[in-house]
Design a protein with these regions (language model features):
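Bacterial N-terminal signal peptides that target proteins for export
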Residues: 1-7
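Hydrophobic pocket/interface hotspot
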Residues: 34, 46-47, 69, 73, ...
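Short, low-complexity N-terminal intrinsically disordered segments enriched in polar/charged residues
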Residues: 9, 16-49, 156-164
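Short beta-strand edge/turn micro-motifs at domain boundaries
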Residues: 110, 127-160
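A short hydrophobic beta-strand element
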Residues: 93-94, 106-115
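A solvent-exposed, acidic/Ser-Thr-rich amphipathic alpha-helical stretch
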Residues: 47-104
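Hydrophobic/aromatic beta-strand elements that line small-molecule binding cavities or substrate pockets
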Residues: 73, 96-102, 115-117, 131-137
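Short, cysteine-centered beta-strand-loop-beta hairpins and adjacent loop/turn segments enriched
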Residues: 86, 118-127
Length: 164
């Protein structure tokens, strides 16, 4: 019986590192570059991480909620800017955690990352936890984002937030 318990512990110890493996850095690079560029307000840098083809698709909580095609990124950015002005949003920032799921089949990949969007709304710090789901394809220039979604509940005042 003791042998079985030790064998089970060894199996768990060997399996644990396999579950904790980090995704391919090359696969994650365009996602991280997109978020970094977004946080800096670098629209061109963020757009460069996305494919500019007919299959580019973005789904976000900002009206009209869905953008498709070669100009999807630019149209989404314009809608986001317009909504931010309408809502009195400033200081947008997205942070990501390690992916909770990655699937790769040759030159195509699917990645889910937990994300948090923080901003100020009329001066009040806000926080919105969500998940971002990405579809990427690898071409001659490397991995590019071909689609993504933002999914989560509505933002709430950040912990301890008070109006200015």
């Amino acid at each position: 019986m003791r042998f079985l318990a030790i064998a089970a512990l060894v199996c768990f110890a060997i399996a644990a590192p396999a579950r904790a493996q980090t995704p391919d850095a090359e696969l994650m690079a365009p996602i991280q570059k997109f978020i970094d560029a977004f946080n800096k307000g670098d629209t061109a840098g963020a757009a460069a991480t996305h494919a500019a083809g007919a299959d580019l698709t973005i789904i976000d909580e900002v009206p009209p909620y869905l953008w498709r095609g070669p100009k999807a990124f630019q149209e989404w950015g314009a809608a986001l800017d317009m909504d931010a002005k309408k809502q009195g949003m400033t200081e947008p920032m997205v942070t990501m955690k390690a992916p909770t799921r990655t699937e790769q089949d040759g030159d195509q990949a699917y990645v889910i990352v937990p994300a948090v969007f923080t901003f100020k709304k009329a001066g009040t710090p806000m926080r919105e936890a969500a998940q971002m789901t990405f579809v990427l394809k690898k071409g001659a220039s490397g991995w590019l984002i071909h689609g993504w979604t933002w999914t989560g509940p509505k933002p709430t005042p950040a912990s301890g937030a008070t109006k200015p």
